Amino acid sequence: MAAMLGDAIMLIKGFVKLTQAAVETHLQHLGLSGELLMAVRALQSTATEQVGMVFGQVQGQETPEEYYSESLDDPEGAFHFSGMRAESASADVSAASSPEQSPPPWAHAAGSEGPAPAYVASAPFREGGVLGQAASPLGRVNGRLFASPRDPFSAPGLQRRVYHQDQSSMGGLTAEDIEKARQAKARPESKPHKQALSEHARERKVPVTRIGRLANFGGLAVGLGFGALAEVAKKSLRPDDPSGKKAVLDSSPFLSEANAERIVRTLCKVRGAALKLGQMLSIQDDAFINPHLAKIFDRVRQSADFMPLKQMMKTLNNDLGPNWRDKLEYFEERPFAAASIGQVHLARLKGGREVAMKIQYPGVAQSINSDVNNLMTVLNMSNMLPEGLFPEHLIDVLRRELALECDYQREAACARRFRELLKDHPFFYVPEIVDELCSPHVLTTELVSGFPLDQAEGLSQEIRNEICYNILVLCLRELFEFQFMQTDPNWSNFFYDPELHKVALLDFGATREFDRSFTDLYIQIIRAAANQDREAVLKKSIEMKFLTGYEVKAMEDAHLDAILILGEAFASEEPFDFGTQSTTEKIHNLIPIMLKHRLVPPPEETYSLHRKMGGSFLICSKLKARFPCKAMFEEAYSNYCRRQAEQQ
């Protein structure tokens, strides 16, 4: 009899669920959802409970044996958020969670519109495992839970407490489950906007030895060779459209989309100096690299692979000592960002303050020279570098810059200096350094909220204008007032917080100083360009050793035209429209001439300076900013001349 009753229970419950599914499908087909679906589910849940009560009472008279009963309508839907439909999210949350709970991870998922993809509401922090899945604070929850037939909480309309077969509410929890619940309670309540690791990032050990890193570059070289052959064959069968616009690097068959994928995969794996070069490619405009390739290279900014837990812990123990966790209340073992030199983890200090811990990849500092040499071998073999770039000079500069970036103690000092310089600024702020958790390979700062500027396109025109205006003013102040500049224009180094309406400045590893001897001449070149004075630009360019004075006329004209084009933004009192300007296209047409006829490499300072200034203009272009620039430069120029006079 008991077996028959059990079968009847299962049959009736199955019929009720089938009816619910059919009704929901029909309602969704008719475009009805929300409260109506909630009502249907509530009726189904009540019906299930009534059936359980009736058969439970009969069962209690027949036998003490227990049968299945469900405490929730859909336990998987309540505890396994990643598979839920967006349109029913509000109904499911209201049914399965208390009102005090923070929004689930999908509330700001990458698929939503506007700037939301850049950050996530991360209150229920993810367990180590599949990104985007939220874990129950009680550990793993099965699709069915055992319940007592005489459960006093099983009355209709009341949510029943779940019991196991041993009549204990804790009987089925393992030590691991209890520990997870304890950690979940200790986790910090995160800020409303938090950076998330790219879905392309994978956990892979950083190749530390020189041979291990060389093997990756060797595999890349072979792959590029086969990819180039395939690209040549494809182009021979389908000639390019002669009317189409080409970027500077489009002429190389080695830089096809397939090869770009190969390069990005290798760079994200080896990280370090090689990935840094890839990040430089990721912030170029259409004139230098076509949009399809730029989109591929864009992944290297936030989708570098991250270290396995064991390798990461070894770095922390070696640098901070074995008891470094004693200073923390919580530490997130999965990073929320991974870049060229290191990866960033969320943590919380004992006092409750949330911090970001940047941990350097092992072997990166020691492998700079070999990485650069290996990468240059691949690039030279594939003929990717146009003539006239003076790669030897460029690589020497890159080596020195990377060596400085690998010194986290130097970066901490630069961040403190910038924080002091901008302490009273109404729009920018620099996160505070946490000295007790800093070392040559670990850098800890306070956690900032917001999203990077490449995700700010959905903001209003007024806010975008204000952001870009302040960035250009800061760029001029760094060069001509501080003479101390953060030269990495990666969009992820500028985080906009819509709640504070401020931009946080991050990553000061690429910070450098500029001598007065350089800035005295450079500001005169910019001034002459703003005034469209070709003779003054030529004179100062020779003084700065941009030119020797012996260049052919074509090279001289191309150089002067390029500088005058760059000065156009500072030449007019009318608002300059960065979104529709043709500056990059005009310069793009001059690059082949300059690469062909250049006699000397540009001054060393200009590599990092032009990277920063060009990146700042690209931010303005991407955000389609529109504002007058002449007054900002005139103010910078007059202030510079005043300080110059005071110091004489």
Curated annotation (Swiss-Prot):
Transit peptide, residue positions per record: 1-162
InterPro entries: ABC1_dom, ADCK3_dom, Atypical_kinase_ADCK, Kinase-like_dom_sf
Self-association state and partner proteins as the record states: Homodimer; homodimerizes via its transmembrane region. Interacts with the multi-subunit COQ enzyme complex, composed of at least COQ3, COQ4, COQ5, COQ6, COQ7 and COQ9.
Subcellular location as annotated: Mitochondrion membrane
Regulation (activators, inhibitors): Autoinhibited by the N-terminal domain, containing the KxGQ motif, that completely occludes the typical substrate binding pocket. Nucleotide-binding relieves inhibition.
Domain comment in the entry: Adopts an atypical protein kinase-like fold: while it adopts a core fold similar to that of well-characterized protein kinase-like domains, a number of features are positioned to inhibit the kinase activity: (1) an atypical AAAS motif in an alanine-rich (A-rich) loop that replaces the canonical glycine-rich (G-rich) nucleotide-binding loop and limits ATP binding by establishing an unusual selectivity for ADP and (2) an N-terminal domain, containing the KxGQ motif, that completely occludes the typical substrate binding pocket.
Listed GO MF terms: ADP binding; ATP binding; enzyme activator activity; kinase activity; protein kinase activity
Pathway: Cofactor biosynthesis; ubiquinone biosynthesis
Motif extent (KxGQ motif): 276-279
Transmembrane segments: 214-230
Region of interest (Disordered), ranges: 90-115, 183-204
Binding site for ATP: 340, 358, 445-448, 493, 507
Enzyme class: transferase
Topological relation to the membrane, as annotated: Single-pass membrane protein
Glycoprotein among keywords: no
Protein name per UniProt: Atypical kinase COQ8A, mitochondrial
Gene that encodes the chain: COQ8A
Disulfide bonds: none
Active site: residue positions: 488
General function of this protein: Atypical kinase involved in the biosynthesis of coenzyme Q, also named ubiquinone, an essential lipid-soluble electron transporter for aerobic cellular respiration. Its substrate specificity is still unclear: may act as a protein kinase that mediates phosphorylation of COQ3. According to other reports, acts as a small molecule kinase, possibly a lipid kinase that phosphorylates a prenyl lipid in the ubiquinone biosynthesis pathway, as suggested by its ability to bind coenzyme Q lipid intermediates. However, the small molecule kinase activity was not confirmed by another publication.
CC per GO annotation: extrinsic component of mitochondrial inner membrane; mitochondrion
Listed Low complexity bias regions: 90-100
Keyword set includes Ubl conjugation: no
GO BP annotations listed: phosphorylation; ubiquinone biosynthetic process
Motif (AAAS motif): 337-340
UniProt-listed Enzyme Commission number(s): 2.7.-.-
Keyword field: ATP-binding, Kinase, Membrane, Mitochondrion, Nucleotide-binding, Transferase, Transit peptide, Transmembrane, Transmembrane helix, Ubiquinone biosynthesis
